[in-house]
Amino acid sequence: MRPVSLAIAAMLAASTAAGASPVPAPVTSAADTSVPRVLVFTRTAGYRHDAIPTTIETLRALGAQVGVEIEASEDPTHFDDATLAGYRAVVFAHTTREVLDIEQQAAFERYVGHGGGYLGIHAAADSGYTWPWYGALVGAWFARHPEGLQAVRVVFEQDAAPLGRRDWRVVDEIYDYRRNPRADVRVIASVDPHSHATGGMGDDHPIAWCHTRAGGRAWYTGLGHDPALYADPVFRAHLLQGLRWTTGQSDDC
């Protein structure tokens, strides 16, 4: 195991009874000069997405742009206090169904509670159905999707538009969710309901959002099923926003 980040390690060593900051600060310190590391976790216990290798490759390229080292693994034993302390953020990339045991779940809860970042991509919402804490972290669980890829209009919030593109036409698999998360998160982007085949979310269909959770930062996008989407500059900029925010490089998700 590599040397852990001094900042996160110090926070994890603190009493869990200590109050967490409502707006978590970047998990770094003057004494910590190491390159920030991010774990991309890709374990699946259900459907396995073809986009996983492309997702890893894209995140590595984006990480290189902002000085973040990306480490990809399907090994759930990374989820213990000491190992998680070495990461600035953890990405759940297309994880499906139950991918962590009870002890690993508890370690991840402590990690986020002490300022660690979480970034979920697409099927990350198809995970952890028996883990209520995770359901709150990801924001909403997957419900259904129309068959095949859909050509839809995605509308970004004014201050969250990547590359200044508020209105974006995209072809991808579009999820409906079991609940609308808007009341509990900051919505980054929504699907135009008139361009979606099922319309199962009604007139308000969030597809990407962020929020703070128990001291950490959580960011999720429902896009990313189609490997071809990762070549789109708008989608890459969208992912980069999430990577920068969850690693504490940006105060705006």
Where do the protein language model's features map onto the residues?
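Bacterial N-terminal signal peptides
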Residues: 5-16
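Helical hinge/lid and interdomain linker segments adjacent to catalytic or ligand-binding clefts
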Residues: 29-32, 37-127
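Extracellular ligand-binding/catalytic regions of CAZymes and related secreted enzymes
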Residues: 31-36, 42, 50-53, 57, ...
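Catalytic beta-strand/loop cores that center a nucleophilic Ser/Cys/Thr
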Residues: 140, 144-215
